[in-house]
From Swiss-Prot:
One biological process term in Gene Ontology: response to host immune response
More details: Was identified as a high-confidence drug target.
Family: Belongs to the mycobacterial PPE family.
One Pfam family in the UniProt entry: PPE-SVP
Full protein name: Uncharacterized PPE family protein PPE22
UniProt xrefs under SUPFAM superfamilies: PE/PPE dimer-like
Xref: InterPro entries: PPE_C, PPE_dom, PPE_sf
Annotated gene: PPE22
Length: 385
């Protein structure tokens, strides 16, 4: 474009009406961000590859992986450098615009010059404004030249700044024939599986009639089933000698546990164990304590034993034994007495537990009847003669 052929109104108007340098500044920031991301990605790739190859993944497969990924890492580094260059060029283009904008004549000045020229020409009746008109025209020519020079400089600077090196596409990290090889392997595997299935079905169909014929012969089937495999015979011969040991060590404890459970159930039904037995057991110590506490102190003596015939008795037996029934007419039983009363039983003795002794014979006076009404026997009084 020939900027010298355009008036200053056009050149200045374009510079002031455009978007300015903001888009170029934003583009420079975006290129910087892309360059930083590519650099970080390249460093991460190299770190992971180094760790895998030297520590965790060794062998030919690891080497092939490194050889496949190395070109891609190099491309990322080269692309990051190109992105940084693009950012620098965008900044240079923005700077060129700012320089041209500062050198261009502002449109208001151009408009004022044109307005003054129009006024001078209008009032130049006698030629008195000829010099002023020439000066105004010269000033306008300078504005024209200034705008043309600024635009030419801006065009050259922006052309250099916007010349970006084309970016190379990323390298292919896989073999071009890998897809075809994979498809061929899948097809071969599918064909092999289908062929194996078909052969298995054909074999099954071929053996099916013989199997059905064998099932129709019960005797042959039984004989075939009775044939013991060798491994089963070996297991039986190995297990029989130690089967009794397994029964004694494993079965008998369970048998004893079953007997114990049965006995516990029976004792609980009889009341020997359970809540009632627990209450009786809890009351037993108190009863024993009361019995022990009620006994008197231990005493001993010599020559004080009571006698029954030639038999000597302990002193407390005499008190524990019941009184003998008195005879009628004896000194101990007056004739005026009422029925014979049975003495109260004394405290239990130590040896025989207070067992009553046999009473003496009462044949002389007789004894009262033990049932019905008792007859009262009275002696003859002295005053009766």
């Amino acid at each position: 474009m020939d900027f010298g052929a355009l008036p200053p109104e056009v050149n200045s108007g374009r510079m002031y009406c455009g978007p300015g340098s903001a888009p170029m500044v934003a583009a420079a920031s975006a290129w910087n961000g892309l360059a930083a991301e590519l650099s970080v990605a390249a460093v991460g790739y190299e770190r992971v590859i180094t760790t895998l190859q030297t520590e965790e993944w060794l062998g030919p497969a690891s080497t092939l992986m490194v050889e496949a990924v190395a070109p891609y890492v190099a491309w990322m580094r080269a692309t990051a450098i190109q992105a940084e260059q693009a950012a620098s060029q965008a900044r240079a283009a923005a700077a060129a615009y700012e320089t041209a904008f500062a050198a261009i004549v502002p449109p208001p000045l151009i408009a004022a010059n044109r307005a003054r020229l129009t006024s001078l020409v209008t009032h130049n009746v006698f030629g008195q404004n000829t010099a002023s008109i020439a000066a105004t025209e010269a000033q306008y020519a300078e504005m024209w030249a200034q705008d043309a020079m600024a635009m030419y400089g801006y065009a050259g600077s922006s052309a250099t700044a916007t010349k970006v090196t084309p970016f190379a596409p990323p390298p292919n990290t896989t073999s071009p024939s890998a897809a075809a090889t994979q498809l061929s392997a899948v097809a071969k595997a599918a064909g092999t599986s289908a062929g194996a299935a078909q052969s298995a079905i054909a074999e099954l169909i071929a053996h099916l009639p013989n199997t059905l014929l064998g099932l129709t012969s019960p005797l042959s089937s039984a004989l075939t089933a009775a044939a013991t495999p060798g491994w089963l015979e070996w297991f039986i011969n190995w297990y029989l000698p130690i089967s009794q040991l397994f029964y004694n060590t494993v079965g008998l404890p369970y048998f004893a546990i079953g007997i114990g459970n049965s006995l516990i159930t029976s004792w609980r039904a009889l009341g020997w164990i359970g809540p009632e037995a627990a209450e009786a057991a809890a009351a037993a110590p108190a009863a024993v304590g009361a019995a022990v506490g009620g006994t008197g102190p231990v005493s001993a003596g010599l020559g004080n034993a009571a006698t029954i015939g030639k038999l000597s008795l302990p002193p407390n037996w005499a008190g524990a034994s019941p009184s003998l029934a008195p005879t009628v007419g004896s000194a101990s039983a007056p004739l005026v007495s009422d029925i014979v009363e049975q003495p109260e039983a004394g405290a239990a003795g130590n040896l025989l537990g207070g067992m009553p002794l046999a009473g003496s014979g009462t044949g002389t006076g007789g004894a009262g009847p033990r049932y019905g009404f008792r007859v009262t026997v009275m002696s003859r009084p002295p005053f009766a003669g």
